[in-house]
Amino acid sequence: MHSLATAAPVPTALAQVDREKIYQWINELSSPETRENALLELSKKRESVPDLAPMLWHSFGTIAALLQEIVNIYPSINPPTLTAHQSNRVCNALALLQCVASHPETRSAFLAAHIPLFLYPFLHTVSKTRPFEYLRLTSLGVIGALVKTDEQEVINFLLTTEIIPLCLRIMESGSELSKTVATFILQKILLDDTGLAYICQTYERFSHVAMILGKMVLQLSKEPSARLLKHVVRCYLRLSDNPRAREALRQCLPDQLKDTTFAQVLKDDTTTKRWLAQLVKNLQEGQVTDPRGIPLPPQ
């Protein structure tokens, strides 16, 4: 029989060895010869090293090396020749950038350096091959990690960029997983007061969002996905908080959200059912059924 004492791990010693390995891999990112393996190892360990983001950000040449990985594959985007190997490698670099994007110590500097903009060419791609799909999904993951923090500075930054039309395009034609992350990003932008005001500021912006959400509802009625539907309903509910958008939604909310189309999909999802009921209630409140009931403007 083994004694428990010998089987017990020695966390401090192991942690120290791991720490030395982390430093070594970060150093190896600076050299093109050792970078690929270092990217792979660090991306595998990123969940278990809480302060990896500051280590990456403050170490010499590391962020430049990660950006070089991204820029290196721009030529493979158009014409679309990206291989699985290239995609895996750059996605490891993106995973490390996601780590920097979501850490409170490095997030502001990450935004100030406009690093998300380096990812936008990937979100512009339309090729349906797996390497491109993986690239888009991982890039969306970086933006998703940013908005998940619920920080005002993130929304303020994103609104100065083209992220909304990029997300809308992916919501219309991406894979189910990409659509889900893109819709989550839009939802997070809408849940911010500045984001909601921005989208409802012009009819063009609102109608673009409403049109894509409407198409998604139609698609979801044919190929249901409870997870994706949840985000779509939340986007609609949030839009209904804006008086002008609420007025427009009374005309353009898809019938499938008003009838029993999704009853089966949502039977166990009390949260989404509650949101949907609230949405319908919001659109009914203060509604004038007879236009003759609207007072005429003063002559």
Curated annotation (Swiss-Prot):
Keywords: Acetylation, Activator, Cytoplasm, Nucleus, Repressor, RNA-mediated gene silencing, Transcription, Transcription regulation, Translation regulation. The keyword ATP-binding does not apply. Induction: Up-regulated by EPO and EGF. Transiently up-regulated by retinoic acid in F9 teratocarcinoma cells. Detected at low levels in bone marrow and thymus. It is found in: Nucleus; Cytoplasm, P-body. GO terms for biological process: cytokine-mediated signaling pathway; mRNA catabolic process; negative regulation of intracellular estrogen receptor signaling pathway; positive regulation of epidermal growth factor receptor signaling pathway; regulation of translation; regulatory ncRNA-mediated gene silencing. InterPro entries: ARM-like (IPR011989), ARM-type_fold (IPR016024), CNOT9 (IPR007216). Its main location: nucleus. One of its GO terms (cellular component) is cytosol. GO terms for molecular function: epidermal growth factor receptor binding; kinase binding; protein domain specific binding; protein homodimerization activity; transcription coactivator activity. It holds the Pfam family Rcd1. The modification N-acetylmethionine is found at residue 1. Component of the CCR4-NOT complex which is one of the major cellular mRNA deadenylases and is linked to various cellular processes including bulk mRNA degradation, miRNA-mediated repression, translational repression during translational initiation and general transcription regulation. Additional complex functions may be a consequence of its influence on mRNA expression. Involved in down-regulation of MYB- and JUN-dependent transcription. May play a role in cell differentiation. Required for retinoic acid-induced differentiation of F9 teratocarcinoma cells. Does not bind DNA by itself. Belongs to the CNOT9 family. Homodimer. Component of the CCR4-NOT complex; distinct complexes seem to exist that differ in the participation of probably mutually exclusive catalytic subunits. Interacts with MYB, ATF2, RARA, RARB, RARG, RXRA, RXRB and RXRG. Identified in a complex with ATF2 bound to target DNA. Interacts with NANOS2. Directly interacts with ZNF335. PANTHER family: CCR4-NOT TRANSCRIPTION COMPLEX SUBUNIT 9. This is CCR4-NOT transcription complex subunit 9. It comes from Mus musculus.
